[in-house]
């Protein structure tokens, strides 16, 4: 039995109230989140622009002298209580970097192929926008939780907006009156961008919310029960804690071995612990941002194990990360992400203008 016109109109009125007030309360922060996320599409290029001392003409080459000097810098950082890691050259950033997290961004020196340090200024660069986009510059837990909640609100607001205008989607696509009265012109801009870029808006909001969901959603009770009742795994021989990290073995042979073990042409970064060296594959050539890992002993460099993320849940999460971060994208697709992000930002800004 079909619903009566009065019922449908009441539903649209309720959706309009929800769309208006939730959009007003969360819209300003969401506009900032989308604006900084749009700029983050070119975060590496922004960092290059802010570090003109680093030449970008050389191809991404990883050499033994650069890795040897990087290992020295890394050990010096560890001696000061820091936890630096190595970011390996890639097609977008063809230099070796020794990075350390300062609470908001990863900063550190960049090394040339012969091992010398480029005299570049220390700056967060494009990572400032990336960090603001995901944490509002408010810390990993508090900021990520707030951004995740705002993402959920945006999904509700977008759904309510479609419920309001579902009967007029086609007119909203073809009717644009830039010289009409200002409220009408702003509404047309809001509706046009909202309808045209609605698929992108839902995709980018949903994937971003899922990525941050662990910040606010607890583990399912079934998983907790399974972990509690599953038989204990065989314990590995305990390793006595080291007073200080052991010296780092030659890294270039380990990187080449990791490429073979991970069946990849490039590795992206290297993490260090007092006992292990973890080399992660590059995910710039695949839609699934899963990053399988080859792990070696820090003491002598012998191979320990490979950690692959091939489960269905890991593949699903990797797909969400790949779609959101767009590291796989070509230069043209990256510009398409950027233009879509600008359009969504303009849509939110136009909607906010209607209130003032």
Segments predicted by a language model, with ranges:
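Conserved histidines in hydrophobic membrane contexts and catalytic metal-binding motifs
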Residues: 1-356
């Amino acid at each position: 039995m079909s619903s009566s016109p009065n019922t449908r109109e009441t539903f649209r009125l309720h959706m309009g109230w929800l769309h208006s007030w939730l959009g007003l309360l969360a819209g300003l922060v969401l506009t900032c989140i989308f604006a900084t996320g749009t700029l983050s599409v070119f975060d590496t290029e922004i960092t290059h622009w802010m570090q003109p001392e680093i030449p970008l003409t050389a191809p991404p080459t990883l050499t033994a002298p650069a890795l040897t000097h990087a290992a020295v810098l890394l050990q010096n950082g560890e001696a000061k209580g820091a936890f630096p890691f190595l970011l390996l050259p890639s097609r977008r950033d063809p230099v070796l970097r020794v990075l350390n997290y300062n609470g908001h961004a990863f900063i550190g020196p960049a090394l040339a192929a012969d091992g010398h340090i480029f005299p570049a200024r220390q700056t967060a660069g494009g990572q400032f926008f990336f960090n603001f986009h995901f944490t509002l510059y408010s810390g990993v837990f508090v900021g990520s939780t707030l951004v995740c909640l705002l993402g959920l609100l945006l999904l509700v607001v977008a759904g309510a907006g479609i419920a309001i205008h579902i009967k007029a989607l086609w007119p909203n696509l073809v009717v644009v009156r830039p010289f009409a009265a200002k409220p009408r012109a702003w509404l047309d801009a809001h509706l046009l961008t909202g309808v045209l870029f609605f698929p992108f808006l839902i995709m980018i909001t949903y994937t971003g919310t899922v990525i941050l969901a662990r910040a606010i959603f607890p583990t399912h009770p079934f998983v907790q029960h399974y972990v509690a009742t599953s038989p204990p795994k065989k314990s590995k021989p305990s390793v006595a804690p080291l007073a200080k990290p052991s010296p780092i073995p030659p890294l270039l042979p380990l990187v080449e071995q990791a490429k073979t073990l991970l069946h990849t042409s490039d590795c992206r970064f290297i993490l260090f612990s007092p006992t292990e060296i973890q080399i992660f594959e590059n995910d710039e050539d695949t839609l699934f941002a899963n990053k399988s890992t080859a792990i070696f002993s820090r003491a002598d460099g012998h191979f320990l194990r490979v950690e692959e993320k091939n489960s269905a849940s890991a593949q699903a999460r990797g797909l969400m990360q790949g779609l959101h971060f767009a590291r796989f994208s070509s230069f043209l697709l990256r510009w398409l992400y950027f233009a879509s992000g600008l359009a969504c930002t303009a849509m939110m800004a136009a909607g906010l203008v209607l209130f003032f």
